[in-house]
Amino acid sequence: MPPGSMSEARQSALKPGKLIRAQLTTQAGLDCIDFAARHHFQYILYDAGWYGAERSTTSDPLAAIPAIDLPKVIAYGKERGIGVILYVNYVGLRKKLDSILPLYKQWGVAGLKFGFVDGLTQHGIRWLADAIRKVNSYGFILDIHDNYKPTGLSRTFPSLLTQEGIRGDEHGPDAWHTTVLPYTRFLAGAADFTFCFPNAAGSFSKNLKVSKAQQLALTVIYYSPLQSMFWYGRPADYTNEDEIEFFKYVPTVWDETRYLAGDIGKNIAVARRQGDTWYLGCAAGMEDWDTVVKMDFLKPGRDYHITVYEDDGKGGIRRRMMTLRRGSRLPVRIRAKGGMAMICN
């Protein structure tokens, strides 16, 4: 067993899932925990700033700012089955990682997010490999952000659930970009896209260059055992439960994957299975997409109840139901920049 690796029992305790980012107060953490529990998420994240200015050498990742009662938030999360993930910038990691890990374990932290690491130089990559090993030995889950790209270390150290290394949703990518990524970046491994789904308060609406239904679909198309959802939103702003219902049910790890149709930079259709349930994500690039998907991956001899989430033509989500069987032909008609997500069970 490689140094820093873990037993199968400890590996099975690592929990993939979805997270929502909390604002930098105690109450925001508690509110996000309630939201996460209601929507079948597994984690909340305190991101940059929870221990002070992230790039300052005087900020201490061993102590939270006064606005956050971290023991209270972590304890409440345990009551509700929600883990707390903490962000630490590379400035703090380089100085204090060996102190951070035992302390966070004592606090009951579920995982870490590394920020602004050096994923380009030989020195930086060697440091990261050693840091990943250490995090893994403590049983934390790990998400590495910014320019680090997957190199296969998650095979040896399963605590490493995902990493950024991608121009994610925060940058407002267009539909050409979103339909190129499945054929390029995602060949290398998981990526945390930090979905910025708009809400009733208009968060990120001006920056979003694809439809809401495409955002739903991308959570199937894009593989990441840890998915960051609602990146710029607060729980109180998400008042339309019908629009975000799909996020409640979509898993982040899979038993089987089928790539059904697509053309790089133009469109993509992916089906993934967890247990007996299939999830489909279809996304169009900068042009309308009209095709037919054969449902040959479904189990024979039974009817599947299908829930479709698609664009309603007014900027929202429309939900409809149908029944399909193995071999059925599913028409896919998606407007440019749009998408369609499905649950088949």
Regions picked out by a protein language model, each given a short descriptive name:
Residues 1-79, 338-339:
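Conserved structural scaffold segments of CAZyme catalytic domains across common CAZy folds
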Residues 213, 217-258:
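Catalytic cores of secreted or luminal carbohydrate-active enzymes
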Residues 263-300, 340-341:
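Carbohydrate-binding surface patches
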